[in-house]
């Protein structure tokens, strides 16, 4: 059974005439008659009552019973084509994007607003997690695209570096270091430090920097997310190493840059290596890459004191 045969059945049923149906379909009438006969043979039933000559034809009882199914199959086929055209044209669809908490607010959010304005029919799902968890969700297909922090070693994920994100030391206004214009990693030695939870990119970056400088901070709190860490810092519990972009504009905290070469992390766009990137994801990726040129990522770290 072929789709075109079903279309022929519908045309003959509507025209009630083989010759008129053949003209409508731009077919030779014998070819149309043969296709209908082949379908009837395959189904084992006659679909049309054929009168003598080239007169009107009518559906048999079996043809009447099967015609609604013909309508349904042809309508569903057209719907499949229309939906595919809508998806490739980004009229409709779904896009799942992951990012670390600090990247959602200042990087992903403005890009998603712009994307939604351009493609309002695309449903957006946002997943907030650490880079390692996001890599797992990429490889499992749970997310299409993710903003992660390098390095990523999973061979199943391809990454494209976007920008270097400077890190600062966040302290309360009355903290002894608040008067400093810059701090050294060595200044973290013995310093009460509020630390992010295990698996958090910033925790790994901070501890690696301390090991490289042979310093040992005093961890007064561990296991927090970004909002909790900044709240503990504001309460005077300790300092925290955070991305400059994570500092709220209305924050009273002091953000002190590190002396050169400073501390930073590399933010990258990641996707599954063994699959083509969906068109909608490619469009969003282009917008995220363009954020660098439009200076929407982060203010200079030294501007927050």
Model-flagged regions — what are they?
Residues 192-213, 277-286, 292-303:
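Secondary-structure junction motif
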Residues 130-143, 148-149, 197-256:
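Hydrophobic hinge/microswitch elements
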Residues 12-31:
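Short helix-boundary/capping micro-motifs
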Residues 42-45, 66-88:
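Alpha-helical linker/hinge and terminal dimerization helices associated
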Residues 90-155, 216, 223:
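Central regulatory/effector-binding core of bacterial HTH transcription factors
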Residues 96-98, 167-168, 176, 183-202, ...:
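Short loop->beta-strand "edge-of-pocket" segments that line small-molecule binding or catalytic clefts
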Residues 40-59:
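A short LG(V/I)-centered, amphipathic sequence patch enriched
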Residues 155-161, 165, 180, 187, ...:
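Beta-alpha-beta core module
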């Amino acid at each position: 059974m072929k789709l075109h045969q079903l279309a022929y059945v519908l045309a003959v049923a509507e025209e009630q005439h083989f010759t008129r149906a053949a003209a409508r379909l731009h077919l030779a009438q014998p070819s149309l008659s043969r296709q209908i006969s082949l379908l009837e043979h395959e189904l084992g039933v006659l679909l049309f009552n054929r009168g003598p000559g080239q007169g009107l034809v009518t559906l048999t009882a079996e043809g009447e019973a099967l015609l609604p199914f013909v309508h349904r199959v042809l309508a569903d086929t057209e719907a499949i084509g229309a939906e595919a055209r809508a998806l490739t044209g980004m009229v409709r669809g779904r896009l799942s994007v992951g990012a670390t908490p600090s990247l959602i607010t200042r990087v992903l959010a403005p890009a998603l607003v712009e994307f939604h304005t351009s493609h309002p029919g695309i449903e957006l799902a946002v997943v907030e997690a650490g880079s390692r968890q996001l890599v797992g969700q990429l490889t499992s297909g749970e997310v299409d695209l993710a903003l992660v922090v390098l390095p990523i070693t999973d061979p199943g994920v391809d990454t494209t570096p976007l920008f270097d994100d400077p890190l600062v030391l966040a302290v309360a206004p009355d903290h002894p270091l608040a008067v400093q214009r810059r701090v050294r990693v060595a200044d973290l030695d013995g310093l009460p430090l509020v630390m992010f939870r295990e698996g958090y990119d910033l925790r790994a970056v901070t501890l690696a920097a301390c090991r490289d400088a042979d310093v040992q901070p005093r961890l007064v709190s561990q296991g927090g997310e970004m909002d909790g860490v900044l709240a503990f810092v504001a309460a005077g519990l300790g300092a925290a190493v955070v991305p400059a972009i994570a500092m709220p504009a209305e924050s009273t905290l002091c953000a002190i840059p590190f002396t050169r070469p400073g501390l930073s992390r590399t933010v990258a766009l990641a996707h599954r290596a063994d699959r083509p990137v969906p068109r909608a994801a490619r469009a969003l990726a282009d917008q995220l890459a363009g954020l660098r040129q439009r200076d929407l990522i982060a203010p200079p770290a030294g501007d927050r004191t």
